[in-house]
Amino acid sequence: MKKTLVFLFALAFPLLSRAQNINFEQYFLDEGSLRMDVFQCGTSDSSHYVFERFILEPHFGGSKVNLIDPFNFGTNRVKVIDAQTNTLIYSRGYNTLFREWQTTEEATRMERCYEESVSVPLPRNEAYIILEIRNFNGEFEEVFSKLYEPNEMFNTTEQRYVFPVYDVMVNGTPESKVDIVILPEGYTADEMPQFQQHCQNLVNVFAQQEPFASHIGDFNFRAVLAPSEESGIDIPASHTWVRTILNAHFYTFYIDRYCTTRNYFSVKDVAANAPYDQIYILVNSNQYGGGGFYNFYSMSTAGNMSSSSVIVHEFGHAFAGLADEYEEPDSPLGLLYTLNVEPWEANLTTLVDFESKWADLVAPNIPIPTPNTNQYNNTVGAFEGGGYLTEDMYRPQRNCMMRNYAPFCAVCNRTIEAVIEAHSDVLVSVKPELLLPEPSLRVCPNPATDFIDVFVDQVDSQAEILDLNGKAILSVQLKDMANRIVISDLPQGVYVFHVNGETKKFIKQ
């Protein structure tokens, strides 16, 4: 083993603080948001991230009080770690289109790259932007980290698209309201008045649908007047191809009604014209369809007779992380679930840990599982069928907006109201089960080029950097809880950092 003197830089302060009451002014600048663009590339059973850029954008629409995500929702999660104090200062769960693509047959035979982008409040000092993916045991795993350096010359402030913003309904400041930015897809410049009317129709839909109707004053709706060259959107089955600003299309994964876009950077570029918590894309089409991804975007057509129900259904996905409650045995999306763990979505259960879901809403005389009969209409129980599966997955009530466009069930109502509250300027308590200890070993950035920052919970620890064959390449003495290790002389490749019986893989570029 080659012993090398490695430069260790004490970053000071103990391992990650878990208090949810983060002081915004201490860690963030009130000057907009930081956006990190990446590509997620992979196949059905593997993936990796490629960093694209940091963008400093003019608006931040989130709460300045509830900076730590009080929920445990999403297939993915972004964390912001203050690099000097190793403090968790922001987190948010989300879903991606890439994760759904991984369930398709195509993903078993080829690799694809999907655009992904996360926006966080603008850090005052150096901070790590960490991306995590939920594994099939229901636990988040760190898969990528990048150091944000405020003085880095390539942090761009360039705004690709600048368009007028139309205030559809504004009830208060961005930090105290749920901010929805509405984007037009397939509306030409001459059709902007029609788009504005469709935006008003969307607000009217929310104002008539509980629980949004009772909380309509907690929402802001703004629309970006961004025209497309041509009217309509792509319909691959009929070889209809339209030049639009967001490049949306039907037939996602060959499902006729599934309307999405892979051009997520363009979505974020247009949305950057206004503060937002949620992005809603209105499609200029009379065809039935839409799509929704938690804290990613919602999309629905504006001209179909079922548009009102689709608007609310898709927003249930995007805003509250609600799952589809219907069965669709032929859908590959059922592969997203592991039946020996609880789904992360609030409105599904495998009954593995029903007490952690909605057991408190079930009357003592209701059997679990609950027979799917008229006797139990309008009753909270556990009805088999949901999450595209016909067996071993259970939903709260027989009917719901997330199943068949009925009114939201009691569980979905409760979840939506909790998410609305978390977007306010009132501090929301984080669930105790989410205050689990952070990893006792953290290695950032990953991938790395010149150095890695190693955070441990024990000082004076002997550590090693190993190759994938287990051969020790470097021996390191960690004298502090936070240490910077220069690795510029290491060849490119994958390495394992080993200390106190724990290991972390990292990539040297």
Regions found by a protein language model. Give the residues of each.
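Active-site-proximal segments of metallohydrolase catalytic domains
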Residues: D218-N295
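Extended acidic/polar, glycine-enriched regions
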Residues: A107-P174
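N-terminal prosegments of processed precursors
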Residues: Q20-E116, L335
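Fold-level signature of zinc-dependent metallopeptidase catalytic domains
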Residues: F154-E210, A223-I235
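Active-site recognition of the HExxH zinc-binding catalytic motif
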Residues: S309-E325
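Short pre-active-site segment immediately N-terminal to the catalytic Zn-binding motif
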Residues: Q194, G291-V312
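C-terminal outer-membrane/trafficking sorting elements
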Residues: V6, R18, E433-C444, A448-Q509
